A protein has these predicted regions:
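C-terminal binding/interaction regions
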Residues: 2-15, 21-29, 34-127
């Protein structure tokens, strides 16, 4: 049986939500989208491949070297969310240079940056 048959790609125009979690710490690193093709590519490569609405197929870390080695794949009860437990390579998952895309915490009614800066995006992306 095809494992992707348990997923519902029809709810969001052919996409499912993908959550990347650090396998060692349990920290949420990022949320992205996947279509059937990129999920198959992820399973074949053993590295996270997402679908970007602006870029199309997006092999995470292909430009920066900050790839995500997939340790295990989980789906939710409705089959429309994929959880990837990953080994984050090269430091950061976020294009801002932070370890995680979730680095702003609401404290006393305002957003506070509590994230760890692990690389300089200007040096990595030339921006």
């Amino acid at each position: 049986m095809d494992p992707l048959a348990s997923l519902d790609f029809t709810k969001s125009g052919g996409l499912v939500t993908a959550i990347a979690v650090d396998d060692a710490t349990g920290d949420v690193l990022m949320v992205a989208a996947m279509n059937e093709q990129t999920l198959r590519m992820t399973l074949e490569k053993g590295e996270a491949v997402y679908w970007s609405r602006s870029r199309g197929i997006w092999h995470k870390g292909e430009q920066s070297g900050h790839t995500q080695r997939v340790k295990s794949v989980w789906i939710d009860c409705d089959g429309d969310v994929v959880l990837l437990r990953v080994e984050q390579r090269g430091g950061g998952a976020c294009h801002t240079g932070k370890r995680s895309c979730f680095f702003r915490k609401l404290e006393d009614g305002r957003w506070v940056d509590v994230g760890e800066q692990v690389f300089d995006p200007a040096k990595v992306y030339g921006r």
